[in-house]
């Protein structure tokens, strides 16, 4: 194992034979594994050992997969670089000296380095797609409700989904086939429309007649090298039979602001349970609960997590709820409306996954706003609860570039078909 991709290296054997016999899978360390610690990349949960498997872990093991460890991540999923982990930063196997993306950077690095055949990550605002792009692998963010979140340690419930990372589109699709489906323990899961092929069967590269929309707002601000690589990939789709047309999504100009208000607000609520009593390391302040809670959270949380909790609490506080949180939800509805209107004239939307190549290590920690703004192309998808895939599009001098394809709800098969034309 290499690149500090893993927090815990431990073999979890399969419980049955199935389509993933002999396949090794790395699991992000915010997904519960029975008897194996699940830290969320945080000192707060450094010794937490779940007494149960997440639904996706059960399905992996039932399908014959061997889990090889729990992967490094930005603390509680809050980051774009996998540098906020309490267990040290992960290195990018595909771009020396640069970050692997986040927050599922350990999962992407494990696949890129060959430490695991496949991996699971979670995507709240791009946390599967960003590291997939930066590490030159494939990552899928499923439609909200396609994959069970039971056993996922919550950051922002209304936004996040568990998704696969793999070297190829077909392998990512095979993993999605295993983990997708209704779960009675997660009331948000839904059945996709009947009559669809398996996701693996959809990876046939047939894009003849497919209409691809290019949102100008998600392309115009991209780094020059990223834009050139993206344009070349679009030409590949066109040569395979797809047609392209420009579309406009004016609402995405507000998406980053809306996303961070909503995500931080949900985080401030979800992370309230980590107080050293119910969950997390004790504050050891005898006789004074307030001081004990404060000491536990001061010692247990890193700076980025504290920042987001404070901002989220502020956005929900009396007198500011309507000014921030309600306006963010209104912006979210506008984003969804724009996507719905776009899909009336195109089958999928294409953009660079990330508008920039991989950051140099340490670069974004000095400027958190820069890290937030880098999510501009990915967060609108989570706000609209839509599926997306990041596929390697090529490389610049600074590292890999991903192409993101977005589809209507439960349109994963179409995304996989289009993505496989590039992969």
Curated annotation (Swiss-Prot):
GO cellular component, one term: glutamyl-tRNA(Gln) amidotransferase complex
Matching InterPro entries: Amidase, Amidase_CS, Amidase_dom, AS_sf, GatA
Region span, Disordered: 1-20, 75-108, 183-206
Keywords assigned: ATP-binding, Ligase, Nucleotide-binding, Protein biosynthesis
List of catalytic residues: 28, 103, 127
Compositionally biased spans, kind Acidic residues: 10-19
Claim: Protein biosynthesis is one of the keywords in the record: yes
Ranges in a coiled coil: none
EC number: 6.3.5.7
A Pfam family the protein falls into: Amidase
GO biological process: translation
Catalytic activity: L-glutamyl-tRNA(Gln) + L-glutamine + ATP + H2O = L-glutaminyl-tRNA(Gln) + L-glutamate + ADP + phosphate + H(+)
A molecular-function term among this protein's GO annotations: glutaminyl-tRNA synthase (glutamine-hydrolyzing) activity
Family assignment from sequence similarity: Belongs to the amidase family. GatA subfamily.
Main function: Allows the formation of correctly charged Gln-tRNA(Gln) through the transamidation of misacylated Glu-tRNA(Gln) in organisms which lack glutaminyl-tRNA synthetase. The reaction takes place in the presence of glutamine and ATP through an activated gamma-phospho-Glu-tRNA(Gln).
Subunit field text: Heterotrimer of A, B and C subunits.
Protein name per Swiss-Prot or TrEMBL: Glutamyl-tRNA(Gln) amidotransferase subunit A
Organism: Natronomonas pharaonis (strain ATCC 35678 / DSM 2160 / CIP 103997 / JCM 8858 / NBRC 14720 / NCIMB 2260 / Gabara) (Halobacterium pharaonis)
Gene designation per UniProt: gatA
């Amino acid at each position: 194992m290499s690149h500090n991709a893993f927090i815990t290296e431990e073999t979890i054997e399969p419980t049955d034979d199935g389509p993933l016999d002999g396949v090794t899978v790395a699991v992000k360390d915010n997904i519960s594994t029975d008897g194996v610690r699940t830290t969320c990349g945080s000192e707060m949960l450094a010794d937490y050992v779940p007494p149960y498997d997440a639904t996706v872990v059960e399905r992996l093991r039932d399908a014959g997969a061997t889990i090889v460890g729990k992967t490094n991540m930005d603390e509680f999923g809050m980051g774009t670089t996998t540098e906020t982990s309490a267990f040290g930063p992960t290195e990018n196997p595909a771009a020396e000296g640069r970050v692997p993306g986040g927050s599922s950077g350990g999962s992407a690095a494990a696949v890129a380095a060959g430490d695991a055949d496949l991996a699971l990550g979670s995507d709240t605002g791009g946390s599967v797609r960003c590291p997939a792009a930066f590490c030159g692998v494939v990552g899928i963010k499923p439609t909200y409700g396609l994959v069970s979140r039971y056993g996922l340690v919550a950051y922002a419930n209304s936004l996040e989904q568990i998704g696969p990372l793999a070297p190829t589109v077909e392998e990512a699709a095979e993993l999605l086939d295993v983990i997708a489906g209704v779960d009675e323990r997660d009331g948000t899961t839904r059945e996709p429309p009947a009559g669809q092929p398996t996701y693996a069967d959809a990876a046939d590269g047939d894009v003849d007649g497919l209409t691809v929309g290019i949102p100008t707002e998600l392309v115009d601000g991209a780094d020059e090298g990223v834009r050139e690589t993206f344009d070349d990939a679009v030409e590949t789709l066109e040569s395979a039979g797809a047609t392209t047309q420009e579309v406009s999504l004016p609402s995405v100009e507000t998406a980053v602001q809306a996303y961070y208000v909503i995500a931080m607000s949900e985080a401030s609520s979800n992370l309230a349970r980590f107080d050293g009593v119910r969950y997390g390391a004790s504050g050891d302040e005898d006789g004074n609960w307030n001081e004990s809670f404060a000491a536990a959270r001061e010692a247990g949380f890193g700076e980025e997590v504290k920042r987001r909790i404070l901002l989220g609490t502020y956005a929900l506080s009396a007198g500011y709820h309507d000014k921030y949180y309600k306006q963010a939800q209104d912006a979210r509805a506008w984003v969804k409306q724009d996507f719905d209107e776009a899909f009336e004239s195109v089958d999928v939307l294409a953009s660079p996954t990330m508008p920039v190549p991989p950051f140099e290590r340490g670069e974004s920690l000095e400027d958190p706003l820069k890290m937030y703004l880098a999510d501009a192309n990915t967060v609108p998808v989570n706000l609209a609860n839509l599926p997306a895939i990041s596929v390697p599009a090529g490389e610049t001098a600074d590292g890999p570039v991903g192409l993101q394809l977005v589809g209507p709800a439960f349109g994963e098969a179409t995304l996989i078909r289009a993505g496989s034309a590039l992969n």
